[in-house]
């Protein structure tokens, strides 16, 4: 009996030792196995500038975890890039800002062998952009658009009557109209690079003038803007979307897709706010926002994967349908909602396109003069 008990005890101890040894071995093997780090990507984009599920789709398809941050002006992005070590792998500057940042050595060239969808790009558009980026070495277009006037139909009519010049820059550049529109609120983009060329064009100058006298304090364009300054309610490059949609302002000089988003939000809210977007008859600027990779990016392969993903016709079509901005992928147009593909405020017709002008890069001296002017103007000096 005792022998049996002793044998049973020995067997139990042996099994216990075996289990402990197995656990130690298993732990050792687990510890020895390399842990695969999650692939990551840091993406810095404009606010309200991507479809709701674009990033989630990319993460699901690739297994890459995306950290997505937003900005609302080129100046904010530029400050981060020029300071260095921004931490971002993919950013979206406007083409003119991209051009001067290329000169500063901020970006690395794209590896086009990793971009199988490069063939989908609008080649005439790429030719235009090559003037800012030789051989299109550094960037590809994400979305593009125009700068125009968004206005609350009823409020503008109330302040100015039936004959309000809503099809002209006169609406916002003539003090006699602006003095009245101040009652319902006027918003301007917070960007000298966007607004000053429009003022130059309005007074009959080259919107891309290289003449320093056109940027002097007493120049025609500068005085035009100073004369309307008392009537501008706010300078901001994103808040005007909701402010216009909610009826908090009645006029916004802003970007086409933003104003169309405001229109859509007002319709969804059924709040009685009716908004229109107009490309003024005098013409306006057209701009391109680019996908580029900073020189100090840590995850360049993943950045290329996202660029390639965003050039897929089905993906970029979903983005255009959501943000109301046109894209540079012709094959996507058949996938767009009818209200977008047929809307000449989004995809301008030939007659309107003829009045559009791309912006060029300023010289450092003109940049400095513009920055100083804009600071003075905003503070009312």
Regions from the language model: what does each represent?
Residues 99-146, 165-173:
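Hinge/lid segment of periplasmic solute-binding proteins
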Residues 38-101:
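Early extracytoplasmic/lumenal segment of secretory-pathway proteins
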Residues 21-32:
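Bacterial N-terminal signal peptides
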Residues 108-119, 269-285, 294-296:
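Short beta-strand->loop
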Residues 184-276:
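Ligand-binding pocket segment of bilobal, Venus flytrap-like solute-binding proteins
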């Amino acid at each position: 009996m005792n022998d049996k008990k002793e044998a049973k005890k020995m067997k139990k101890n042996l099994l216990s030792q075996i289990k402990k040894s197995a656990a130690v071995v298993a732990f050792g093997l687990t510890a020895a196995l390399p842990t695969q780090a999650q692939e990551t990507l840091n993406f810095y984009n404009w606010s309200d500038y991507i479809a709701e599920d674009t990033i989630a789709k990319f993460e699901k398809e690739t297994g890459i975890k995306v950290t997505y941050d937003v900005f609302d002006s080129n100046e904010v992005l530029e400050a981060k890039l020029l300071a260095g070590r921004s931490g971002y792998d993919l950013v979206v500057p406007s083409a003119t800002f991209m051009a001067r940042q290329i000169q500063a050595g901020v970006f690395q060239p794209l590896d086009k062998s990793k971009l199988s969808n490069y063939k989908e790009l609008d080649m005439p558009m790429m030719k235009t952009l090559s003037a800012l980026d030789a051989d299109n070495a550094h960037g590809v277009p994400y979305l593009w658009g125009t700068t125009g006037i968004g206005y609350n139909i009823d409020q503008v009519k109330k302040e100015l009557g039936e004959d309000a010049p809503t099809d002209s820059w006169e609406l916002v550049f003539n003090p006699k109209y602006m003095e009245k529109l101040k009652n319902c609120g006027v918003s301007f983009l917070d960007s000298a690079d966007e607004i000053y060329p429009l003022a130059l064009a309005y007074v009959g100058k080259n919107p891309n003038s290289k003449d320093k006298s056109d940027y002097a304090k007493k120049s025609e364009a500068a005085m035009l803007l100073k004369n309307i300054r008392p009537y501008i309610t706010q300078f901001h490059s994103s808040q005007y979307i909701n402010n216009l949609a909610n009826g908090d302002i009645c006029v916004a000089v802003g970007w086409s897709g933003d104003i169309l988003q405001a229109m859509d939000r007002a319709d969804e809210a059924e709040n009685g706010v009716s908004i229109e977007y107009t490309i003024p008859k005098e013409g306006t600027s057209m701009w391109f926002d680019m996908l580029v990779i900073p020189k100090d990016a840590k995850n360049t392969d993943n950045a290329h994967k996202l660029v390639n993903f965003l050039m897929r016709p089905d993906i970029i079509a979903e983005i255009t349908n959501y943000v109301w901005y046109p894209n540079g992928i012709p094959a996507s147009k058949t996938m767009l909602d009818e209200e977008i593909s047929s809307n000449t405020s989004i995809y301008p017709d030939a007659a309107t396109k003829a009045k559009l002008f791309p912006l060029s890069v300023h010289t450092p001296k003109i940049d400095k003069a513009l920055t100083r002017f804009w600071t003075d103007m905003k503070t009312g000096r």
